[in-house]
């Protein structure tokens, strides 16, 4: 399929996707009933969309195009209410978190969808292993060239986004010692990590054409990059965050990305170059492994800085942009989180350290999601 022309979007408009866990009480393992749940709610959703993801234990909530985080929060809240009622009617529960702490990938059923079945054919068991749960944020751009500039700018802050959203310390019944283990699942995919270097939209079109020769890439949706342009929507899509345990944190993360995008495209503070990515995977690893306690290194100067310090600097830089787009509350909440030194991964570990079981942890996550 040829790459579509870049759709002109209103700059800094917002779209958010949340991949949620569908679980079966009282054992709280992943359910395989998302299709039943989607059928139950599809005629009750008036704004946004509830839809499938890769496997039958995943449920995606997606907003429409939103002006700001307040509009997005309203749409999510309405969808949450409908989904929770339908889940209760079918004796299911819903929760966030980047991984389910004890599910077995061998049990996961890929959705009966042409695209997902084709992906299963291409990638085999890797697709079942990809039963992990992330938050994706789209930001509108006025042109393809703006999208490429924004993508490179946001890529500088991938470690910050990962550290702030880290919520996947457990996988397959094991403490992984990572704050965010979810991104590791995609390391075996040939398109894992950052997008290959291009400097403008014309070069991106040539890159996509080359990738399509592999026969594994039919559309932009087949690419698993950390950040990718979405020409059909006219957006840049950030894909590195774990799904948070609460809607409020999800909205705050979206506000952070929207405000960062506003600052980047308004101020144009960087002259991007390929060398910017020299230490990308090392810095990304630090965020996944240690969260805000990780240390990132500047590829140009060799300077090292904790992610706590680097994130506080970012929040300070983007505060004026956040004020202009109505996202100040998100930046203030994230500032409090950084100062506290806590993320959701650490809260999960604290629960288990206090004697809680992994079954009890999922139950608690369902209570958090339902109680907000």
Swiss-Prot record:
One Pfam family this sequence matches: GCS2
InterPro entries in UniProt: GCL_type2/YbdK_subfam, GCS2, Gln_synth/guanido_kin_cat_dom, YbdK
Disulfide bonds: none
Superkingdom, taxonomy of origin: Bacteria
Reactions it catalyzes: L-cysteine + L-glutamate + ATP = gamma-L-glutamyl-L-cysteine + ADP + phosphate + H(+)
Keyword ATP-binding attributed: yes
EC number per UniProt: 6.3.2.2
Quaternary structure (record): Homodimer.
PANTHER family: GLUTAMATE--CYSTEINE LIGASE 2-RELATED
Task performed by this protein: ATP-dependent carboxylate-amine ligase which exhibits weak glutamate--cysteine ligase activity.
Entry protein name: Putative glutamate--cysteine ligase 2
Organism: Escherichia coli O1:K1 / APEC
Name of the encoding gene: ybdK
């Amino acid at each position: 399929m040829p790459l579509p022309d870049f759709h002109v979007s209103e700059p800094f408009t917002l779209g958010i996707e949340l991949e949620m866990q569908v679980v079966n009480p009282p054992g709280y393992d992943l359910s395989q009933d998302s299709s039943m749940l989607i059928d139950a709610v599809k005629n009750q959703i008036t704004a946004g969309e509830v839809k499938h993801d890769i496997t039958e234990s995943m449920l995606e909530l997606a907003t429409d195009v939103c002006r700001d985080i307040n509009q997005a929060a309203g749409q999510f809240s309405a969808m949450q209410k409908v989904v929770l009622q339908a889940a209760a009617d079918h004796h299911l529960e819903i929760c966030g978190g980047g991984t389910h702490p004890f599910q077995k990938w061998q049990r996961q059923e890929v959705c009966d969808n042409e695209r997902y079945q084709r992906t299963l054919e291409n990638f085999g068991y890797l697709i079942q292993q990809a039963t992990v749960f992330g938050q994706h944020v789209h930001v509108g751009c006025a042109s393809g060239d703006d999208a490429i500039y924004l993508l490179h700018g946001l890529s500088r802050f991938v470690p910050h986004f990962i550290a702030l959203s880290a919520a996947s310390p457990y996988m397959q019944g094991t403490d992984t010692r990572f704050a965010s283990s979810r991104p590791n699942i995609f390391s075996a995919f040939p398109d894992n990590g950052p997008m290959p270097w291009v400097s403008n939209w014309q070069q991106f079109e040539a890159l996509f054409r080359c990738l399509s020769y592999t026969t594994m890439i039919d559309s932009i949706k087949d690419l698993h990059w950390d950040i990718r342009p979405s020409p059909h929507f006219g957006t840049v899509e950030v894909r590195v965050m774990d799904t948070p345990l609460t809607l409020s944190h999800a909205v705050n993360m979206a506000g952070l990305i929207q405000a960062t995008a506003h600052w980047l495209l308004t101020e144009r503070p960087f002259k991007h170059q390929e060398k910017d990515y020299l230490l990308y995977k090392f810095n990304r690893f630090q965020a996944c492994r240690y969260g805000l306690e990780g240390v990132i290194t500047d590829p140009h100067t060799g300077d090292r800085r904790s992610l706590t310090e680097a994130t506080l600097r970012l929040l300070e830089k983007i505060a004026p942009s956040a004020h202009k787009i109505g996202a100040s509350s998100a930046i203030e909440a994230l500032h409090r989180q950084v100062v506290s030194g806590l993320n959701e991964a650490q809260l999960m570990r604290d629960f288990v350290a206090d004697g809680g079981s992994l079954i009890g942890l999922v139950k608690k996550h369902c209570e958090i999601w339902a109680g907000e």
